Amino acid sequence: MSFAGQVAIITGASSGIGWALARTLAAEGCKVGLVARRREQLADLAGEIEKHGGTVAFATADIAEREQAVSAIRDVAARLGPVDLLIANAGVGAPTTIEPFNVPDVEKMFRVNVLGVVYSLEAALPQMLARGRGHLAAISSLASYKGLPGESGYTASKAAVNIFMEGLRIQLRSKNIAVTTICPGFVKTPMTEVNEFKMPWLLTADDAAWRIVRALKRKRKVYNFPWQLSLFLKCARWAPDWLVDRMMHTYNEKPPFPKTPL
């Protein structure tokens, strides 16, 4: 399958996986739409894509705010054309502490990681239904497969994305609209570079983007990578609770996100 000439819109495009996806899809011949909060970074990325002969448009929005998210995505689509591929990539992460019990951070993660996906799809889905074709994708995480100490809010938000996309995929099966859930492992991005522990099978953002685009071309329903970490977490998901608790005891001492509020 070729993406040449198709319109692809990516949220959270100002850094990390979103930035790399935009460059990769532009190289594939897509007209690329960029949505994120940071205008300066979006302008830099748009300039880079245009320098290499690509077609690009961008708009700023806080993806956790419904009106902003829908308006920005539809504004970009109005300039580039009907959306063929929407990638809901925007996401945030923070530790879930118990002393104090940081409910505001959990709320923020659910607003961005879950509702941000819903709002993004809301902006593109009606147009796809009217045209009778399209592709919706969401970036989840391998962390969604197991509740991890210190990550309760993050892992729960990503698990919610998985279930939401699964149900939507079945609903849209007869509408000729593909739905893909992407679950990466550790990827070198601004969100993970603060981690104080060794990240197994760490990938660059460019490598992750290449793998994701390949999965989207194949219209994979769910794509988990790298396979080694995926296998480990899936085994942990079905392992006895007493064994998992023992395995995770050391992990519990070092939460994966910096202890700063979102």
List PLM regions with ranges.
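Residue(s) in the substrate-gating loop at a strand-loop-helix junction
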Residues: 141
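Conserved glycine-rich Rossmann-like NAD(P)H-binding loop of the short-chain dehydrogenase/reductase
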Residues: 30-45
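Conserved glycine-rich cofactor-binding loop
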Residues: 7, 14-15
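Substrate-binding pocket helix/loop in short-chain dehydrogenase/reductase
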Residues: 97-110
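C-terminal helical subdomain
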Residues: 181, 197-232
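Active-site helix of classical SDR
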Residues: 121, 157
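The beta1-alpha1 cofactor-binding region of Rossmann-like NAD(H)/NADP(H)-dependent oxidoreductases
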Residues: 39, 60-71, 103
